[in-house]
Design a protein with these regions (language model features):
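Flexible, compositionally biased loop and terminal segments
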Residues: 1-236
Length: 236
């Protein structure tokens, strides 16, 4: 069995950041207050990730299905995204964090795709953490788009993995807020991910919670569909 440190080397962690609205409701606050608190949680978790051996952190910020939410809430989320890009890019670059946004950009409000491109260019040299934020993202749509690009002749498991996985398969997938579903997030990339569900709402999720999730991951025995050597010997 690998040591916890070895198993955390270059870890790709992904988080479904759920519970902002319920966090706000429990405090008698509007949903927007929960989303604003959620941005602060992003900052804390991204800062803590490298020390825990996480090389890539993918965060589910806005799904393609989230366009169905009330226009006022969607507008607030887009303003938060714009403010995050404007206010955090320089700090991310200084800290060695490379920012990448995945998902569709052609439906985002005017100016945001350009702000994303500027932030990605400004942080491109970052080698401490690869921070990926999923916006207007659907894993099923991403798989279909990749298959269309590859075409019948180019379609294979390896080619699809290369087209989708970018920094590699997800090792640890965390969902906050108590729900236990994947919600169309990284379905191909998380095929063998270890799942960690927590009741904690996203705005309350911090460095200690991330460390606990990584410790839980490190204690697991990942077999990727096979058997451990002792079991193979016993079965022979």
């Amino acid at each position: 069995m690998q040591s916890p440190l070895d198993r955390r080397s270059g870890l790709h962690a992904a988080i479904i950041m759920d519970g902002n609205g319920r966090w706000a409701r429990a405090r008698g606050l509007p949903r927007g207050a929960g989303h604003r608190a959620g941005v602060k949680a992003i900052q804390q978790v991204a800062e803590a990730a490298p020390a825990l051996g996480i090389g890539t952190l993918t965060l589910y910020a806005f799904s393609s299905d989230n366009w169905r939410r009330p226009a006022e809430e969607v507008g607030g989320l887009m303003r938060l995204l714009r403010a995050y890009l404007r206010g955090e890019t320089e700090r991310l670059a200084r800290s060695g964090t490379r920012l990448t946004v995945i998902g569709r950009r052609n439906r985002l409000p005017a100016g945001i795709p350009e702000a994303i491109a500027r932030a990605e260019a400004a942080t491109e040299a970052g080698d401490r953490l690869n921070l990926r934020i999923a916006v207007d993202y659907s894993s099923r749509d991403a798989i279909l788009a990749a298959a269309a690009r590859l075409g019948p002749e180019g379609l294979s498991r390896d080619a699809m993995s290369e087209a989708l996985c970018g920094p590699g398969d997800v090792d640890l997938l965390i969902r906050t807020g108590g729900e236990k579903r994947l919600s169309d997030f990284l379905l191909w990339e998380a095929a063998y991910a270890e799942l960690h569900f927590t009741e904690r709402m996203w705005p309350d999720f911090g460095a200690a919670d991330l460390a606990a999730a990584v410790a839980d991951f490190s204690a697991r025995d990942r077999r990727f569909g096979g058997l451990n050597p002792p079991l193979l010997t016993a079965a022979a």
